[in-house]
Amino acid sequence: MAVPKMVFSDVESFLDSHPELFEDYLNRKGSSSMVEKWLKNHQAGKSEAEPKEEKSSVCKDSWASKCDGLQRRASQKELRKTFARSKAINVNRTYDEHVNSRAQEPLTSMRRRALLRKASSLPPTTAHILSALLESRVNIPQYPSTAVDFKYYLKEHNEREFFLELVKDISNDLDLTSLSYKILVFVCIMVDADRCSLFLVEGTGNKKTLVSKFFDVHAGTTVLPSMNSGEVQVPWGKGIIGYVAEHGETVNIPDAYQDRRFSDEIDKLTGYKTKSLLCMPIQNSDGEIIGVAQAINKSSSGELFTEDDEKVLQMYLPFCGIAISNAQLFAASRKEYDRSRALLEVVNDLFEEQTDLEKIVRKIMHRAQTLLKCERCSVQLLEDIESPVVKFTKSFELLSPKCSADAESSFKDSMEKSSYSDWLINNSIAELVASTGLPVNISDAYQDPRFDAEADQFSDFHIRSVLCVPIWNSNHQIIGVAQVLNRLDGKPFDDADQRLFEAFVIFCGLGINNTIMYDQVKKSWAKQSVALDVLSYHATCSKTEVDKFKAANIPLVCELGIDKLSFDDFSLDVDAMITAALRMFIELGMVQKFKIDYETLCRWLLTVRKNYRMVLYHNWRHAFNVCQCMFAMLTTAGFQETLTDVEILALIVGCVCHDLDHRGTNNAFQAKTGSALSLLYGTSATLEHHHFNHAVMILQSEGHNIFCNLSSTEYSDLMQLLKQSILATDLTLYFENRNSFFELVSIGEYNWNVKTHRDMCRSMMMTACDLGAVTKPWDISRKVAELVTSEFFEQGDRERSELKLTPSAIFDRNRKDELPGLQLEWIDGICAPLYETLVKLNPKLQPMVDMINANRVKWEELDKKRQHDHGASVPASPCSAAEGSETGGVPCCSNNTPPTHVS
């Protein structure tokens, strides 16, 4: 029976009239490839609404009408499949043609609330914020390709338009994967080949290979093959493909099996029979071969590839070379961007975690696996970085999730084994890197003599490639090694991997070193805490002593004589000074007004006494004498009536504590020797800051806080005043403030109601009490001067022996006969102006000035006798008193002769 001749338009018209027949046929005969082809053509048809050329308008209209018809008949299931497919495709796309249109759509109130809930449900971490900031803002446009059938139509009706269409399709694609696929399909169409393959050159120098991610692609294929199907690799120079790549020649073979260069390995691998073959190199703009295009078997049975086919490919492949080069450049730049971003994220990880070694190593290994895409990562830390013997004390290991069902447990298991020195596979290479400091990159482990193949054979994990680099600290010392094993793609680690890993490990070394240092600091802090606890126990008084003074009868002020400005500094023994100090607190009403527990006061005074060192002058007796002088000024001179109770308490406590833990040397000596105190407090008022902090430490000790019953405001004010009082004993501050104070008093503008005036007055009172020995009767004043000089001589001896310096006159034991002259300078330059000004403010202090003048006469007589005995005047050493002061840098006096004495 003769079949009537039909044309496509008749069939299409019939199907339009009977859609149920078309659906029935599609359900019975349709395949998944047909559906995928329809989806792709449907998307392409939507983007081609208007033709650019009159000549192709009829054909494009027919394809569009067909797609529209199919779209009208699409079921909800097909629409869901379309959405799912488009979503899968767009997951990793850098550009979405629908993004801008969606962004312009107004948000409904419901959607706005949903977005707000999503945004505010969890606070963003720094890692998420950094990731968002580093997200690439470069959008690469992607244009859909026209249908394959349409390209066949153009090939038959308009070769020029056909060629331009193929060039346009590849020129807009910067994704190397989709570009390679397009080139294969287009080559098949151009030369009418049954199969096509594209091999790209990878590697450099003598390590070049030809790799094909898409092999044996049909011209009618519309969906990209799976990336999991594996890739075909051809060695450089092997087979016809290798020959073409090596020599850059076109090969057109009518019968491949008759050519000795042909290798049938791929045919055996694919089960496909190669007959005719056309193979041509692809070059970049520099003429370098970057790939090989291969067309296999003409679609028309029995036909061979012609010279026209060669000419067509010779015209088209240069455009392919440009497109491939651009895609490779973009891929390389994208890879560098990803690596740079990963390194920044590593830095963020290291700054986020610097306290736990296990956590930071774990983050490092996760990042290393992400960066280098390896199966296994390990970090080993040296036991002693100074030792020439390599011994690892800690080893950490992490398996890739693709190699281990539970990466968490694999990490923990390796931690449990960290006490064993031989648990880590291939430990010999790690030891080699740790000893030499040079990285090791092994592409084939079993071919390298440094690799322990026997250990690998007994393991469940088999090593192919190894990259091991040293970990350095900030002092360029090796603290460990980092090692990655087996790239996931099966390739060896290349030079780019090694450079990246070395850069990565630099940051890791800093992070690990900081964590180790933190651990050391934490241990040191613990040791210090224990030491302070022990010292605190031995630095505090015993309960027996406290009970003794708590039960003792306290003599009256008149019995002790502590209210006199001429009090004998050596009249009381060490225990009597405690009872006298208790009497001062009681007499001033401090115990009652501030509700000071009497037992706590006894304990505090005894502990303060115990924390004064047994030096010649700056000891407990000096502290008590300064406190007694302040007590006399407050009571006898009447300053108690002018100052507040909090100010009085701060002054008394400040006097008792103003030289706590004095070492018998001044501030200048601390700076010269670079002592721990100068490093801790700096070179400005070094000892005074230490005295205050030591006082605070005692107050904070259990059972010693005599201020515990003060209100928070009173306590805060008192501590500020206490610090000010103790720091005021630094003569540098005295010289900074005295001119202003002297001028205010001299012109009668001093005002007790002005805070700055009161602050200056209290500071001057502290200095006056600290230097009070010069106002005592001659025998007492001279004895104190000799004690001070003896202490200075000991410092001078240390300067000469330890620092190899010649001490100034006041510290030089060989010049002790110059003491009278230095004392005259001390009185005239520092003491007399201070007390004379205080007398103008409070005339009741006149006895102190009178005694200074009397003592000056005595020193002047001794100085004249010294000059007479020597037969000439011997001037004092310049700036000797400046060094005698605890500041070591006080200004010289008005007569340009520096003062000499110090309290």
Swiss-Prot record:
Gene3D superfamilies: 3'5'-cyclic nucleotide phosphodiesterase, catalytic domain, 3.30.450.40. Residues 175-324, 356-512 form the GAF domain. Residues 863-903 are annotated as: Disordered. It holds the Pfam family PDEase_I. GO terms for cellular component: cytosol. SUPFAM superfamilies: GAF domain-like, HD-domain/PDEase-like. Residues 893-903 have a biased composition (Polar residues). This is Dual 3',5'-cyclic-AMP and -GMP phosphodiesterase 11A. The gene is pde11a.
